[in-house]
């Protein structure tokens, strides 16, 4: 078991260095805090986008070389290696170059001098090394391959060849324009992602994470399989404001996995349930693993519309995981936990209402006031500042204790360290989006998008399902080595236009948001896909289980998540999209949103039925053990409930409403047949 634990440490996260120096630690804290202050400043007083992106990336590059060593050693050092200091200074100077010489570069666009090109090469090399340190080699290697392709285009096989670009042109395009490093991905990191990561960091530091866990356990802990069910709910709540699968697993799993084991779940299943719940946390609006902002920017949609499209799949996904946990609990005969370990439900609920308020302010500003995501995050952060400053004095006043200056200062200290933690979290995202910009820049420089379109069409023909399967496989493979955000940018940039073109060619009028969410979903699933599955390694470390078996079991639980992207790709109503009206669009992408509340409830309800039926088929269990003929009856429930329009298209049903009614009828019939034998011992239930 020690072997497993030692091995797992490599995958949970890239370790930061330890240096026994107060000056070093104070400087890191000050730099991180300064970055957060800068981001809040430009949220209220916007700078030129090129300048703000350059400064944003300079903070990230500098911190990477100060925080992350060339290779990780557990032994602490007394000082920072000289070469890392050189990397830090060179990296910061190079990345700030476009900001310092902004007007000069604007005057000589496309006619760069030697100094511009040398700095560009230096910056790209530094970024590749920063990416290797903070994320591992996968993304830098992919970027290098694209850069090689940019230059050696004429020597490539005919089907992917192009005229090639000079090294000078590549360097200028990638670093001195907004087509590469300083393109849309890092622009979203500057404008949106940082503020929402800071919001999540402040909430966590204030105590919201523990509150969500306590609330979930107070509500569900005493019921059958209570700890596992509470884990699902707590991960969903935490996932709303967390941008990382692994962070979600570690935050919630540290508390829930031991209690799941105590309730009777095996180490593997306890870890796997937390992995599935933690990974799916990235699907939950409003943050959605930070990719929601990039999706909105890529598609020219409002962030609110991206959340609208994601809400039914996210809730269907979590409710079906809750159902799977219930089925596992019934099969294993699990009990709840002693409720005396927790305070009363009402007392726990009331104790953290102030944590829910900033989330409500965020949602109100976005959905009701219809302000920008930047304004919504800024307002919510401001309210959180007040909560953190006054929550300790307020608690003491309520309990009749004396309030002193130290109680107020404690709130300011929490704010400081939350801002430091947010900056450290953002180093990975900022570097990932900068490197992903190189890939996006390569596509615009070489015309690779059209080449890929021809190549995919050659491989898959007109088979749209084959193209989707290839895309899912690509997302899973790349996601094993890339952060979710970078994986989404890479795959969507390469494949999304191809899927849209071929879908429309085959008569499927698919909105772009469906393709982008499809890619996003499978990128997330990579976090629990063996053999890498970083979230699985994190959970395995807590559960003291084998990370591969935890990953396999977690992926098995997440198979229900894997069918959802196919469902909403073909049935856009699952994304609240009525139709795609290209002749008279209601917005820039021609999307007509659903407006009938009853129809929305019907679609949501049937999505739950379809996902529950699929979950029962996976588990072989419903009210009790499923017989073969009952499984046969449940199989058609899944397509009838999730993609009724496809059933109508192929002449299997006269209309969607009839498809829904047949699905509901079959599901109810199987429930009744199961109810009649629910008290029988499992070994007495005949297979047929």
Question: Would you name each region that the model predicts?
Answer:
Residues 1-107, 117-121, 661, 672-674, ...:
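Conserved, well-structured core domains of diverse proteins
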